[in-house]
Protein backbone atom coordinates (compact mmCIF):
# COMPACT_ATOMS: atom_id res chain seq x y z
CA UNK A 1 0.00 0.00 0.00
CA UNK A 2 1.53 3.28 -1.06
CA UNK A 3 1.10 6.43 0.97
CA UNK A 4 0.21 9.73 -0.72
CA UNK A 5 3.09 12.15 -1.05
CA UNK A 6 3.26 14.44 1.96
CA UNK A 7 3.58 17.39 -0.39
CA UNK A 8 0.30 16.59 -2.18
CA UNK A 9 -2.22 19.43 -2.11
CA UNK A 10 -5.13 18.50 0.17
CA UNK A 11 -8.30 20.54 0.70
CA UNK A 12 -10.13 20.97 3.98
CA UNK A 13 -13.41 22.74 4.70
CA UNK A 14 -13.09 25.49 7.30
CA UNK A 15 -15.04 28.50 8.47
CA UNK A 16 -13.84 32.07 8.11
CA UNK A 17 -12.66 32.19 11.74
CA UNK A 18 -10.58 29.00 11.54
CA UNK A 19 -6.83 29.57 12.13
CA UNK A 20 -6.16 27.87 8.76
CA UNK A 21 -8.02 30.74 7.05
CA UNK A 22 -5.94 33.43 8.77
CA UNK A 23 -3.05 33.41 6.23
CA UNK A 24 -5.60 33.79 3.42
CA UNK A 25 -7.23 36.83 4.99
CA UNK A 26 -3.93 38.37 6.09
CA UNK A 27 -2.25 38.12 2.68
CA UNK A 28 -5.40 39.25 0.86
CA UNK A 29 -5.35 42.38 3.03
CA UNK A 30 -1.72 43.07 2.07
CA UNK A 31 -2.39 42.36 -1.61
CA UNK A 32 -5.53 44.47 -1.88
CA UNK A 33 -4.02 47.34 0.11
CA UNK A 34 -0.96 47.48 -2.16
CA UNK A 35 -2.99 47.30 -5.38
CA UNK A 36 -5.84 49.59 -4.45
CA UNK A 37 -4.22 52.15 -2.14
CA UNK A 38 -5.96 51.31 1.12
CA UNK A 39 -4.46 50.44 4.48
CA UNK A 40 -4.02 46.79 5.45
CA UNK A 41 -6.09 47.46 8.57
CA UNK A 42 -9.01 48.85 6.56
CA UNK A 43 -8.92 45.98 4.06
CA UNK A 44 -8.63 43.40 6.83
CA UNK A 45 -11.68 44.88 8.53
CA UNK A 46 -13.58 44.90 5.22
CA UNK A 47 -12.68 41.25 4.53
CA UNK A 48 -14.02 40.23 7.91
CA UNK A 49 -17.30 42.16 7.60
CA UNK A 50 -18.77 39.48 5.33
CA UNK A 51 -20.87 37.33 7.67
CA UNK A 52 -18.99 34.08 8.31
CA UNK A 53 -22.22 32.08 8.21
CA UNK A 54 -22.67 32.98 4.52
CA UNK A 55 -19.51 30.93 3.84
CA UNK A 56 -20.98 27.92 5.66
CA UNK A 57 -23.30 25.07 4.72
CA UNK A 58 -25.88 24.72 3.43
CA UNK A 59 -25.50 27.71 1.08
CA UNK A 60 -21.77 28.39 1.15
CA UNK A 61 -18.38 27.06 2.06
CA UNK A 62 -14.71 27.84 2.48
CA UNK A 63 -11.86 25.57 1.44
CA UNK A 64 -8.18 25.80 2.30
CA UNK A 65 -5.57 23.90 0.31
CA UNK A 66 -2.81 22.47 2.47
CA UNK A 67 0.63 21.50 1.24
CA UNK A 68 2.62 19.58 3.83
CA UNK A 69 0.10 20.86 6.39
CA UNK A 70 0.62 24.52 5.45
CA UNK A 71 -2.21 26.67 3.99
CA UNK A 72 -1.14 27.66 0.46
CA UNK A 73 -4.43 28.40 -1.31
CA UNK A 74 -8.02 28.99 -0.40
CA UNK A 75 -11.33 30.46 -1.31
CA UNK A 76 -14.96 30.70 -0.36
CA UNK A 77 -18.38 30.81 -1.92
CA UNK A 78 -21.81 32.00 -0.89
CA UNK A 79 -25.29 32.00 -2.35
CA UNK A 80 -25.83 34.55 -5.12
CA UNK A 81 -29.24 33.22 -6.18
CA UNK A 82 -31.02 29.85 -6.29
CA UNK A 83 -28.85 28.53 -9.14
CA UNK A 84 -25.68 30.58 -8.71
CA UNK A 85 -22.90 30.63 -6.14
CA UNK A 86 -20.54 33.59 -5.84
CA UNK A 87 -16.82 32.99 -5.38
CA UNK A 88 -15.08 35.13 -2.77
CA UNK A 89 -11.65 35.35 -1.15
CA UNK A 90 -9.80 33.34 -3.82
CA UNK A 91 -6.13 33.41 -2.85
CA UNK A 92 -2.84 31.59 -3.32
CA UNK A 93 0.16 32.30 -1.09
CA UNK A 94 2.56 34.49 -3.08
CA UNK A 95 5.38 31.99 -2.42
CA UNK A 96 3.38 29.18 -4.06
CA UNK A 97 1.95 30.85 -7.15
CA UNK A 98 2.33 29.58 -10.73
CA UNK A 99 2.26 25.94 -9.58
CA UNK A 100 -1.34 25.10 -10.45
CA UNK A 101 -2.70 25.47 -6.92
CA UNK A 102 -5.23 28.16 -7.88
CA UNK A 103 -6.63 26.02 -10.70
CA UNK A 104 -6.85 23.05 -8.35
CA UNK A 105 -8.67 25.28 -5.84
CA UNK A 106 -11.18 26.45 -8.45
CA UNK A 107 -11.86 22.84 -9.48
CA UNK A 108 -12.40 21.82 -5.85
CA UNK A 109 -14.66 24.81 -5.16
CA UNK A 110 -16.67 24.07 -8.32
CA UNK A 111 -17.12 20.43 -7.24
CA UNK A 112 -18.41 21.59 -3.86
CA UNK A 113 -20.64 24.20 -5.50
CA UNK A 114 -22.19 21.56 -7.77
CA UNK A 115 -22.73 19.27 -4.77
CA UNK A 116 -24.72 22.09 -3.11
CA UNK A 117 -27.08 22.22 -6.10
CA UNK A 118 -25.80 25.34 -7.84
CA UNK A 119 -25.33 25.33 -11.62
CA UNK A 120 -23.47 28.60 -12.11
CA UNK A 121 -20.56 30.42 -10.54
CA UNK A 122 -20.37 34.21 -10.50
CA UNK A 123 -17.44 36.30 -9.29
CA UNK A 124 -15.95 39.73 -9.43
CA UNK A 125 -12.34 40.77 -9.25
CA UNK A 126 -10.75 44.18 -9.32
CA UNK A 127 -9.42 45.75 -12.48
CA UNK A 128 -5.92 45.84 -10.96
CA UNK A 129 -5.64 42.06 -10.75
CA UNK A 130 -4.73 40.89 -14.26
CA UNK A 131 -3.42 37.58 -12.90
CA UNK A 132 -6.85 36.81 -11.47
CA UNK A 133 -8.54 37.72 -14.74
CA UNK A 134 -6.16 35.40 -16.62
CA UNK A 135 -6.83 32.57 -14.15
CA UNK A 136 -10.60 32.83 -14.52
CA UNK A 137 -10.49 33.08 -18.32
CA UNK A 138 -8.17 30.06 -18.56
CA UNK A 139 -10.50 28.12 -16.25
CA UNK A 140 -13.57 28.50 -18.44
CA UNK A 141 -15.10 31.62 -16.93
CA UNK A 142 -16.68 34.16 -19.28
CA UNK A 143 -16.09 37.83 -18.67
CA UNK A 144 -19.42 39.65 -18.50
CA UNK A 145 -19.77 42.64 -20.78
CA UNK A 146 -21.95 44.88 -18.66
CA UNK A 147 -19.97 47.35 -16.58
CA UNK A 148 -20.39 47.18 -12.84
CA UNK A 149 -20.57 50.26 -10.63
CA UNK A 150 -17.16 51.53 -9.59
CA UNK A 151 -16.28 51.68 -5.92
CA UNK A 152 -14.08 54.76 -5.79
CA UNK A 153 -11.23 54.11 -8.19
CA UNK A 154 -11.81 50.36 -8.17
CA UNK A 155 -13.62 48.94 -11.18
CA UNK A 156 -14.96 45.43 -10.62
CA UNK A 157 -14.74 42.93 -13.46
CA UNK A 158 -17.41 40.20 -13.41
CA UNK A 159 -17.17 36.60 -14.61
CA UNK A 160 -19.65 33.75 -14.95
CA UNK A 161 -19.26 30.03 -15.52
CA UNK A 162 -21.94 27.40 -16.06
CA UNK A 163 -20.92 24.13 -14.43
CA UNK A 164 -21.48 20.74 -16.07
Regions found by a protein language model. Give the residues of each.
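Conserved catalytic-core motifs of GNAT/GCN5-like acyltransferases
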Residues: 16, 44, 122-127, 133-158
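Active-site acidic-Proline motif in GNAT/NAT acetyltransferases
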Residues: 93-99, 127
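Conserved GNAT acetyl-CoA-binding A-motif
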Residues: 106, 113-125
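Residues that form or flank phosphate/diphosphate-binding pockets in enzymes
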Residues: 20, 100, 131
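Short coil/turn segments at alpha/beta junctions that flank glycine-rich nucleotide-binding fingerprints
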Residues: 83, 99, 115-119
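Acetyl-CoA-dependent GNAT
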Residues: 4-88, 93-94, 106-108, 112, ...
